[in-house]
């Protein structure tokens, strides 16, 4: 029970290990878990390598992902750590947002240096908006030549800079997950140093409550004598009664004032992120608003139709399509609470996309949706999900 009482007092941070398969992500995850357990036994649970390595299958929006969740604490923070062992698992996890990361540890084997998958993971981390990367130069016990280690470190820093991260300033810590697991004091200290770097350099995440208010509209009602009420679950921010808001998406942006907030038939003074509530909107008729729009703090988000995205297309086994699709494919894009038809353009050189592939694409929606980079969506056909993606760049 000791665990529960710490949970509220410390910042909670989501991190993960990313990088090339066989560079030791899972071993390092197990080593972090063990080193922190040995250092702070009252704060941490004992986990062995096998329990992390046998990553359980999860289904996120119908997509099968093997992923391990490990919790641990330093003196400063409580961490939830995700480790997706396979390359395909990592890509699915990043694109579907199954596990959001506030920061990630890029694991690069000192014996190999950055490989093709290392590059792909760093690019994807930037596209889906992982705010911070730092580097664990793993298997450093196997490289005797200091100059070679310096060279690999330089290569990794250049890779980070080329993908829009701060390669000059990012901490690069030389570690050995395996030796730390075996209890070798020099390498146990290296893992402690790595976690000290994570504590210091990964910024505290901005909590949902501190972001600008946004509530997707799920339903619209008329209350006789009072006006129009929209219901939904507040995604982020807080909203006080008598605040001005904008209704964004599908139609031209409308401004209104929230004259009442209700939750479970009780009147509230404000709505908070995570709560299901009804908002009474001044001067709007039932036909002025619809499901799929969002109620937002004025000026915080804008409607768009054209964007670039990174998408994972479900395999046949996951209940996806049985055959490929080409440019000009017109499925539905499900954003928050509604489907909007869109036309897909595949990148140059990509003839078609097979079930089970991940791809970049450009999409033109027939109606505008309140959108920002990093927003997730599902691709649907006749009500069933055939893909999952994230907006990587807004075009118009």
Curated annotation (Swiss-Prot):
Gene3D superfamilies: P-loop containing nucleotide triphosphate hydrolases, Translation factors. Residues 176-178 are annotated as: G5. Pfam families: GTP_EFTU (PF00009), GTP_EFTU_D2 (PF03144), GTP_EFTU_D3 (PF03143). Keywords: Cytoplasm, Elongation factor, GTP-binding, Hydrolase, Magnesium, Metal-binding, Nucleotide-binding, Protein biosynthesis. Its EC number is 3.6.5.3. Residues 10-206 form the tr-type G domain. Mg(2+) binds at residue 26. It is an enzyme of class 3 (hydrolase). It catalyses: GTP + H2O = GDP + phosphate + H(+). The keyword GTP-binding applies. Residues 83-86 are annotated as: G3. Residues 62-66 are annotated as: G2. One of its GO terms (cellular component) is cytosol. Monomer. GTP hydrolase that promotes the GTP-dependent binding of aminoacyl-tRNA to the A-site of ribosomes during protein biosynthesis. This is Elongation factor Tu. The lineage of its organism: Bacteria, Bacillati, Actinomycetota, Actinomycetes, Micrococcales.
């Amino acid at each position: 029970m000791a665990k529960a009482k710490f949970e509220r007092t410390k910042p909670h941070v989501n991190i993960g290990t990313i990088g090339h398969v066989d560079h030791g992500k899972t071993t390092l995850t197990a080593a972090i878990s063990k080193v922190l357990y040995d250092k702070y036994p009252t704060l941490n649970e004992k986990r062995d390598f096998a329990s992390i390595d046998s990553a359980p299958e999860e289904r996120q929006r119908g997509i099968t992902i093997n992923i391990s969740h490990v919790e641990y604490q330093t003196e400063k923070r409580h961490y939830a750590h995700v480790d997706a062992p396979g390359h395909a698992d990592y890509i699915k996890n990043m694109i579907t947002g199954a596990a959001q990361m506030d920061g990630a540890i890029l694991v690069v084997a000192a014996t190999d240096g950055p490989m093709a998958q290392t590059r792909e993971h760093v690019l994807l981390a930037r596209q889906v908006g992982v705010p911070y990367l730092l580097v664990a130069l793993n298997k450093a016990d196997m490289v005797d030549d200091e100059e070679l280690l310096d060279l690999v470190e330089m290569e990794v820093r250049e890779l980070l800079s080329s993908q829009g991260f701060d390669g000059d300033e990012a901490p690069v810590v030389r570690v050995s997950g395996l030796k730390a697991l075996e209890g070798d004091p020099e390498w146990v200290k290296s893992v402690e140093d790595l976690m000290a770097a994570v504590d210091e350099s990964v910024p505290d995440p901005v909590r949902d409550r501190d972001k600008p208010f946004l509530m997707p509209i799920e339903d619209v009602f008329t209350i006789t004598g009072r006006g129009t009420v929209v219901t939904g679950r507040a995604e982020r921010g807080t909203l006080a009664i008598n605040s001005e808001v904008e209704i964004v998406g599908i139609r031209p942006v409308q401004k209104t004032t929230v004259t009442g907030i209700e939750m479970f038939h009780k009147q509230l003074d404000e709505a908070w992120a995570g709560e299901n509530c009804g908002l009474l909107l001044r001067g709007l008729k039932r036909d002025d608003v619809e499901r799929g729009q969002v109620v937002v703090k004025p000026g915080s988000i804008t409607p768009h139709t054209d964007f670039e995205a990174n998408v994972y297309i479900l395999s046949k086994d996951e209940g996806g399509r049985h055959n490929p699709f080409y440019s000009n494919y017109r499925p539905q894009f499900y954003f928050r609470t509604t489907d909007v038809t869109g036309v897909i353009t595949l990148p140059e050189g990509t003839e078609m996309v097979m079930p089970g592939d991940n791809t970049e694409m450009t999409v033109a929606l027939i109606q505008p949706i309140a959108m920002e980079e990093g927003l997730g969506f599902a691709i649907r056909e006749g009500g069933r999900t055939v893909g999952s993606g994230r907006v990587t760049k807004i075009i118009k």
